[in-house]
Amino acid sequence: MATKISQDNPLSKITIFLIIISVIWVKLNVKPWEKGKVIDWDIVDYYDYLPALFIENDWTLSFVKKNEEYYYNNHIYWPQKTSEGNYVIKMSMGLSYLYLPFFWIGHLEAKIKGLPTDGFSQPYHKWIYLSAVFYFFIGLWFLRLFLLRWFRDKVVAIAIILLVLATNLFYYATHESAMSHVYTFSLFSVLIYLWDRWFAYNKLLTGMFIGFISGLIVLIRPINIIPVVVFPLFYNLIDIKQIKDRVVYLLTQYQQIILMVFFAILPWIPQFYYWHLNTGQWFYYSYGDEKFFFLKPQIINGLWSYRKGWLLYNPLMYLTILGIPVLWKYRRSLFWSYVIIFPLYIYVVFSWWCWWYGGSYGGRAMIDIYPVLIFALAAIIDRIFNLERSLRFFKYVSMIPAFMLIYWNILQIIQYRHTFLHYDSMTKEAYWKLFGKPALSDTAYWSLLSPPDYEKAKRGESEYP
């Protein structure tokens, strides 16, 4: 049953502030901007819309032709080429909206310090990197507000601590934080809170925010249309048969739904314009020969492989499976949205040709739906706190594996940071050779790695050589 949010709930508040302080501390110690290692790889494509528009004043990227080798080799601009020879940025521009205020802060700092104002000097890297802290705080705060509708303060606090510190979310909040996942995690946390408020109070302004945030989430990562659509259909249903009533209710609110759709389209309008400007098409698939293989989903590999198994490298998330019957029995209102989003998302995510998602840590694609997966985690924690007095000792014993999971995640992050836990080439032999060690001096270890065959994977074949 949902509970009224207390104005106090100090433990979960303190938890979030301590997490953010920890994230900032790690960031200020890592300082990747000093080596220009923030706006790089995928982030180049998320970010390039901003300097191209506001500094080069050229969204067609025609200036790249003048020195193409320099731009590509230095990972500054590396757009795709259309069949007509035009340039088009591969990723959609959703993250650029979120980067924008921090881009201008970096631009101002570069001007004040007399550094190049080309969009790629150190201040730009720094502020894009730090932008994730702002959005991560917002995401955690709204996730907390949502969870407090269903769970006690101490349960929410512990669930958030474990979700952040014992999973790959912590790595992407502190190290590669300019990647999309912390941003989409945060936006989806806000979205589920807004849907809860909309169903409770049916406010027009809430609906407008729901629409815009939904459109932005999908623009950043189109695969996220799954939780964006499924959650409001199945949230807070006790019985699956109530889906008919939910659809009927939404149809009776057609004016607000139309308004939501309108606001969902708004963030896409500049993207449509950009595609049309550079390709002549209002909608353009910029991923070339990269695609989904829905008849060959790599679910087993995606969850358990040594290369990049999500559950292997995030063992805490086994509780997201074990917690399903707990949700069914004790938090039925959260159950249906959970059991539909979770397997459907796994199926689609691991149907992508590059199911291991390139150079990354621990199945990063799953982070986007962590605001939903925390339901089962919180439900299990809640049941532990509700054990009979004779079993209360289990509550304290359970703290041991909780601390071990946090320790294990931090250890793996250290391994990954120093490339011992390899970004795409782990094998069974390498995993067990490295197991439990922060580093290795044995040079023979590197011969145990097995890089994936990306070209074979693009054809839907096994990437193992």
Task: Walk through the language-model features, giving the residues of each.
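Membrane-lumen/periplasm interface segments of specific transmembrane helices
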Residues: 230, 237-240, 252-325, 332, ...
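Specific aromatic-rich, kink-prone transmembrane helix
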Residues: 183-201, 205-214, 372-376
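Transmembrane-helix signature of polytopic, membrane-embedded enzymes
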Residues: 13, 111-122, 140-167, 186, ...
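Membrane-interface alpha helices of multi-pass inner-membrane proteins
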Residues: 50, 160-161, 206-222, 228-233, ...
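Transmembrane-helix motifs of polytopic, lipid-linked glycan transferases
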Residues: 126-151, 189-194
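Membrane-embedded, lumen/periplasm-facing catalytic core of multi-pass transferases
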Residues: 31-38, 360, 397-465
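Transmembrane signal-anchor helices characteristic of membrane glycosylation enzymes that use polyprenol
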Residues: 10-40, 48-51, 58, 161, ...
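Start-transfer (signal-anchor) and selected internal transmembrane alpha helices
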Residues: 1-31, 138, 148, 156-157, ...
